[in-house]
Structures are given as C-alpha cells and as structure tokens.
C-alpha cells in the first residue's frame, strides 16, 4: 500500500506487498522488496535496493551521495540492504563511490537511531549498530558484531565478526573477531559473554583463548605470530582459525592492542 502523499517515482520498483508511508520518497531506480515498510518521511534515493521485509523508519535516508570530495554525483552506484534488516530513525546509509559497486548491509541487521554508514562499507548478517554509531568509508563489519552507541570507526578499518565495541570508543585500528574493544584502540580480551550467548562450543572458545594469547605477545607483530600459529596446524575449529586468519588480511596491518 502506498500512501497518497508519498512520492514514488514511476521508474522505482516497489513490490505490491510493500507499505510506503506518508510523505515518504522513493526515487527512480530504487527497489523495494516484498513486505518492506517505509515509515513517514523515509527516503530511498536512486540506487537503494531493499530486500524482503526491510523496515526504514522516520527520516532515515538510504542511498545518499558519499561525503567524498572527489565523488561524481552522476556515478551509478548502489546501497543494498539484506532481508529483515531494521533501519531506525535518522539513519544515513551512503552509496558506493565507484560505478556498479555497492555499500552492502547484510540480512537481519539492526541500525539504531542516528547511526551512519559511509560509502563502500560492508556489514555482515546480524550486525547491530547502536545509536549514534559512525562508520567511515570502506569499513568492514563482520557478522553478528555489536558496535555500541557513539562509537567512531576510522575509514578502511575492520571490525571482526562477533566482536563487541563498547560505547563512545574511537577505533582507528582493526578489531579482531570475537574481541572486546573499548576506549581508543584498546582491547579488553574476548567477548566471552557474546560467545556463550551464541552457543559457541567450549572447544572453540578454548581455541580462541589460545589464539588470543599466542597473537598478543608484547613487542612482537600480530600478523607474523598468527601466521606461525596457522602453520603449526593445531587449530581445529573454524572460530580459532578465523581469529588467526583475520590478522593476515586488511589494508592497514594495524590492530587494537590489550589495555
């Protein structure tokens, strides 16, 4: 159902089962999947693609131009939002900077009020961004990570899956999977509460603890230590291997450190 006051461009694709609220705007080229709900004053810009069951709340803007001084507004790029993701009030999601590329939001995410996802970010499934969280351009956030309120993440950083970043943290370095980050690039160990809530087996948690202590040794590089641990072939769980492999990737090679 489309409210009479909504502005839906004829070139937009809106599934008949979607609900478009009062004064919402859907621009040409936007795609709204089955069962989506756009609240009053929600805005979908050209290039916004919503999977099934996505909720876009009041005054949220999906698909706005990147805040990049070199960006050409004529660039045909996208924001894709996975099924059942909830986008709350005043959230801003910016489209990618290059032609035929996308800022990607996974399925079953929750983007709380006032959070911002900049151009070219990639969020895995089940990510939660709390109120006022800000992600710079090209940030990657792994599945089921929780980024708390007021957190600022520098461009090109990676936030590992299953990690928890505490409120008002400043992150300019990579946070490992299942890590517990706080303050300014500080690490308080593993997110053990989150691991247990997700039902991660005890064997995997034990391997994560072993990997954590193997990689974080004073005065030694995390990447080299992670490579040595993997070469030993002693890690049998996906969680343990993923933790170590994280240190071999990324663009910046800098990681949050234990406080």
Tell what function each PLM region has.
Residues 1-186:
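Structural signal for interior beta-strand "rungs" in well-ordered beta-sheet cores
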